């Protein structure tokens, strides 16, 4: 989830946009034939990641998607003034049944 590395093609990074933008991105990947995608978020965006997965799983593709794995953790982030703080992270892997 660092900004310096390229993002794999099956990853949706959650940020400040509306949830439906990320739902559309996930659905697009699944419709292109990707069998498994990973939704990643950190900090305040974690709730959007959970919402994204639940909307895809329950509203758009019921009985066709399963949650493969959920990983939670934290990252140390250094602010502009040099202070370090921890930010929670989540990665939710979903796949077609």
Curated annotation (Swiss-Prot):
One of its GO terms (biological process) is chromosome condensation. The modification N-acetylserine is found at residue 2. RNA binds at residues 16-17, 22, 42, 44. Homodimer; homodimers assemble cooperatively on DNA with consecutive dimers binding end-to-end. May form higher order oligomers, e.g. homotetramers. Interacts with Alba 2; heterodimers lack cooperative DNA-binding behavior and result in more compact chromatin structures compared to Alba 1 homodimers. Changing residue 17 to A: Decreases DNA binding affinity. Unable to repress transcription. It holds the Pfam family Alba. Its EC number is 3.1.-.-. This is DNA/RNA-binding protein Alba 1. The modification Glutamate methyl ester (Glu) is found at residue 69. The modification Deamidated asparagine is found at residues 31, 58. The modification N5-methylglutamine is found at residue 75. The modification N6-methyllysine is found at residues 16, 40, 64, 97. One of its GO terms (cellular component) is cytoplasm. The modification Deamidated glutamine is found at residue 32. Binds double-stranded DNA tightly but without sequence specificity. Involved in DNA compaction. Possesses DNA endonuclease activity. Prevents transcription after DNA binding. Binds single-stranded DNA and RNA in vitro. Binds rRNA and mRNA in vivo. May play a role in maintaining the structural and functional stability of RNA, and, perhaps, ribosomes. Binds double-stranded RNA (dsRNA) and exhibits RNA chaperone activity. Required for normal growth. Changing residue 2 to A/E/G/L/T/P/V: Decreases acetylation.
């Amino acid at each position: 989830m660092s900004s310096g590395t390229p993002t794999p093609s099956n990853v949706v990074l959650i940020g400040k946009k509306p949830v439906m933008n990320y739902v559309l991105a996930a659905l697009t990947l699944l419709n292109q034939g990707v069998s498994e995608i990973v939704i990643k978020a950190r900090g305040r965006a974690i709730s959007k990641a959970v919402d994204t997965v639940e909307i895809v799983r329950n509203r758009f593709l019921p009985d066709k998607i399963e949650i493969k794995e959920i990983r939670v953790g934290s990252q140390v982030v250094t602010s502009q003034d040099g202070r370090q703080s921890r930010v929670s992270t989540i990665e939710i892997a979903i796949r077609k049944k």
